[in-house]
């Protein structure tokens, strides 16, 4: 009898826990995805803060020349970063217990792998949590679909690209200057500015910013007049009021006269779908571009493609970009390679008689 009562209380406790986890009445919705999201993001954030402040230098290139990234080792907020895991580790799973000591784990950049893997799992769970809350409220799933774009971008630079290149040392450093360094090296090695998917991503991000600014300014400019012509149109309104204050028909008419009729939307749902879909599609393409360049399917190469009747090269802008790429590649990993790979791969020219 006692065992039956204990089992019933245990089942009742589990049921109450499930109800609390999935309740939409909580101030912050947790959900089953949140059960995994909370510990993974807390772990990633905690280790990031500690490592950014105090992590020792990391042998990123695997050549016994450690690179300092933390504040206590001479960096500031701009130059500081979590240095990627050493090339000596490659793509191996490298938790603390795989190293001979904590000092060795830190020297080989173990915190980077720990942070990145927990972070990616956490943001994926955040996306799942968005879908879960939408489902429980009877909403459609497009919020999670929109969030999949930055999740795909983060996964591309932190996981797909290192896998394609064969080492976590090729992942993006976790810091401001580290991000810019990653971008410069990426351009040098993959000519990303000449990749059509990157161009679509730029159009998505900048176009999305433009459309958001246009939409916001139109909405805040087209008031439903509640006053006479002798009074200010702003009279009678207060900031943050619940009642609708703008007229989409008026905004549509204004924009149609400013550009042309069919450049504007007269349907609010179509307009907001477009505002969401444009940047999301662009960022999806960028993530896809990073993933293809991970396998060295690089941007267009028009180097030395224009020649005169004598076969002499007429330099174009593509050749200028190529020269800049070689210069950036020379600066990158200057102690690990004598020459950029582009030069080292070319057979030496015999100058003997």
Swiss-Prot record:
Residues engaged in binding chlorophyll a ChlzD1: 118
Family (UniProt): Belongs to the reaction center PufL/M/PsbA/D family.
Transmembrane annotation, as ranges: 29-46, 118-133, 142-156, 197-218, 274-288
Modification sites for Phosphothreonine: 2
Binding site for a quinone: 215, 264-265
Membrane topology recorded in Swiss-Prot or TrEMBL: Multi-pass membrane protein
N-acetylthreonine: residues bearing it: 2
Free-text function comment from the UniProt entry: Photosystem II (PSII) is a light-driven water:plastoquinone oxidoreductase that uses light energy to abstract electrons from H(2)O, generating O(2) and a proton gradient subsequently used for ATP formation. It consists of a core antenna complex that captures photons, and an electron transfer chain that converts photonic excitation into a charge separation. The D1/D2 (PsbA/PsbD) reaction center heterodimer binds P680, the primary electron donor of PSII as well as several subsequent electron acceptors.
Changes after translation: Tyr-161 forms a radical intermediate that is referred to as redox-active TyrZ, YZ or Y-Z. C-terminally processed by CTPA; processing is essential to allow assembly of the oxygen-evolving complex and thus photosynthetic growth.
Classification via CDD domains: Photosystem-II_D1 (cd09289)
Subunit architecture: PSII is composed of 1 copy each of membrane proteins PsbA, PsbB, PsbC, PsbD, PsbE, PsbF, PsbH, PsbI, PsbJ, PsbK, PsbL, PsbM, PsbT, PsbX, PsbY, PsbZ, Psb30/Ycf12, at least 3 peripheral proteins of the oxygen-evolving complex and a large number of cofactors. It forms dimeric complexes.
Assigned GO CC terms: chloroplast thylakoid membrane; photosystem II
Signal sequence region: none
Site feature location: Cleavage: 344-345
Binding site for Fe cation: 215, 272
Residues carrying the site annotation Stabilizes free radical intermediate: 190
Substrates-to-products reaction catalysed: 2 a plastoquinone + 4 hnu + 2 H2O = 2 a plastoquinol + O2
Binding of chlorophyll a PD1, residues: 198
Binding positions (pheophytin a): 126
Cofactor note (record): The D1/D2 heterodimer binds P680, chlorophylls that are the primary electron donor of PSII, and subsequent electron acceptors. It shares a non-heme iron and each subunit binds pheophytin, quinone, additional chlorophylls, carotenoids and lipids. D1 provides most of the ligands for the Mn4-Ca-O5 cluster of the oxygen-evolving complex (OEC). There is also a Cl(-1) ion associated with D1 and D2, which is required for oxygen evolution. The PSII complex binds additional chlorophylls, carotenoids and specific lipids.
Amino acids binding [CaMn4O5] cluster: 170, 189, 332-333, 342, 344
Note: 2 of the reaction center chlorophylls (ChlD1 and ChlD2) are entirely coordinated by water.
Protein name, UniProt field: Photosystem II protein D1
Disulfide bonds: none
């Amino acid at each position: 009898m006692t065992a039956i009562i204990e089992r019933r209380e245990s089942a009742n406790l589990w049921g109450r826990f499930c109800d609390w986890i999935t309740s939409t009445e909580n101030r912050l919705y947790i959900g089953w995805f949140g059960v995994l999201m909370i510990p993974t993001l807390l772990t990633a954030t905690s280790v990031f803060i500690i490592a950014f402040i105090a992590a020792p230098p990391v042998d990123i290139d695997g050549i016994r020349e450690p690179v300092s990234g933390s504040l206590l080792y001479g960096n500031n907020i701009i130059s500081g970063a979590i240095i990627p895991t050493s090339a000596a580790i490659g793509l191996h799973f490298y938790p603390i217990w795989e190293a001979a000591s904590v000092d060795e784990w830190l020297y080989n950049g173990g915190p980077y792998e720990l942070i990145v893997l927990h972070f990616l799992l956490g943001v994926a769970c955040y996306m799942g949590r968005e879908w879960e809350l939408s489902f429980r409220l009877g909403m459609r799933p497009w919020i999670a679909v929109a969030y999949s774009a930055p999740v795909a971008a983060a996964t591309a630079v932190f996981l797909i690209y290192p896998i394609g290149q064969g080492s976590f040392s090729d992942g993006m450093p976790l810091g401001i200057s580290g991000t810019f360094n990653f971008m410069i090296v990426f351009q040098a090695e993959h000519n990303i500015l000449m990749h059509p998917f990157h161009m679509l991503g730029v159009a998505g991000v900048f176009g999305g910013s433009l459309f958001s600014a246009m939409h916001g300014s139109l909405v805040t400019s087209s008031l439903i007049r509640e006053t006479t012509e002798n009074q200010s149109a702003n009279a009678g309104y207060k900031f943050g009021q619940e009642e609708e204050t703008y007229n989409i028909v008026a905004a549509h008419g204004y924009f149609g006269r400013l550009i042309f009729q069919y450049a504007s939307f007269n349907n609010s749902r179509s307009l907001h779908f477009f505002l969401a879909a444009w940047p999301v599609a662009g960022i999806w393409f960028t993530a896809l571009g990073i993933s293809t360049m991970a396998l060295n399917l690089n941007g267009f190469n028009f180097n030395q493609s224009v020649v005169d009747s004598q076969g002499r090269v007429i330099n174009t802008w593509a050749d200028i970009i190529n020269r800049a790429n070689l210069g950036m590649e020379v600066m990158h990993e200057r102690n690990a390679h004598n020459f950029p790979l582009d030069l080292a791969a070319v057979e030496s020219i015999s100058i003997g008689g």
